[in-house]
């Protein structure tokens, strides 16, 4: 008894494969159509050369004319290639300038916006409802103490202060001074 084996390819992959094959077929048809158009255009534009019955001088004149036409076409092709190269360089430079300008202007980091309770209620309920909610009313008020007023500033000769603070003794005084205001 043979057991039917399920396909290992999923449906999405099958769809992708069929789409890719369809696109490849379409590209192939476009390529063939382009080639046929090219052959038709060349047959229309370029008449067949009739070299039978021409003398040596007539053949040489024909060759000179063809060489002159080839030179003109080559010059045009060279000019067009030079223009293309110039344009591609210019496009590349402009792209670099755009990237450079993008890098110069940094976007500021977004900061958290504090919304008051009133504004939040207004946003939720709409502007019609006049609801005020003062959450700060029940809070205690604390006064700030001026630390500068408490400490008297010693004004004196700065040379004495420098001499007194130099060395290990000065370091000890600074350490003791830093301890004393916090302990009170």
Swiss-Prot record:
Q: Phosphoprotein: present as a keyword of the record?
A: yes
Q: Which residues carry this modification: N-acetylproline?
A: 1
**What assembly does the database describe for this protein?**
Binds to actin and tropomyosin.
Stated family: Belongs to the troponin I family.
Cellular-component GO terms for this entry:
troponin complex
Pfam families, alphabetized = Troponin
Has keyword Acetylation?
yes
For this UniProt record, give its keywords in alphabetical order, as a comma-separated list. Acetylation, Actin-binding, Muscle protein, Phosphoprotein
> Which terms does the UniProt entry file under GO BP?
cardiac muscle contraction; skeletal muscle contraction
Q: Which gene encodes it?
A: TNNI1
Where do transmembrane segments lie in this chain? none
UniProt PTM: In the muscle sample, approximately 25% of the chains were blocked. Pro-1 is probably acetylated.
Organism listed in the record = Oryctolagus cuniculus (Rabbit)
What this protein is reported to do is described as: Troponin I is the inhibitory subunit of troponin, the thin filament regulatory complex which confers calcium-sensitivity to striated muscle actomyosin ATPase activity.
Q: What is this protein called?
A: Troponin I, slow skeletal muscle
Task: From the UniProt entry, list the residue stretches annotated as the region Involved in binding TNC and actin.
Answer: 94-115
């Amino acid at each position: 008894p043979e057991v039917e084996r399920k396909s290992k390819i999923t449906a999405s992959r099958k769809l992708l494969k069929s789409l890719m094959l369809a696109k490849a077929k379409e590209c192939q048809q476009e390529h063939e159509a382009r080639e046929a158009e090219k052959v038709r255009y060349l047959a229309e534009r370029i008449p067949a050369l009739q070299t039978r019955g021409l003398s040596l001088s007539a053949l040489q004149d024909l060759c000179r004319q063809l060489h002159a036409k080839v030179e003109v076409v080559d010059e045009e092709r060279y000019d067009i290639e030079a223009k293309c190269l110039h344009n591609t360089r210019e496009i590349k430079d402009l792209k670099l300038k755009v990237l450079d300008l993008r890098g110069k202007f940094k976007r500021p980091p977004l900061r958290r916006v504090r919304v008051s309770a009133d504004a939040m209620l207004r946003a939720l309920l709409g502007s019609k409802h006049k609801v005020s909610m003062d959450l700060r009313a029940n809070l205690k008020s604390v006064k700030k103490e001026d630390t500068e007023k408490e400490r008297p500033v010693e004004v004196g000769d700065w040379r004495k202060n420098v001499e007194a603070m130099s060395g290990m003794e000065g370091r000890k005084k600074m350490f003791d001074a830093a301890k004393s205001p916090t302990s009170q």
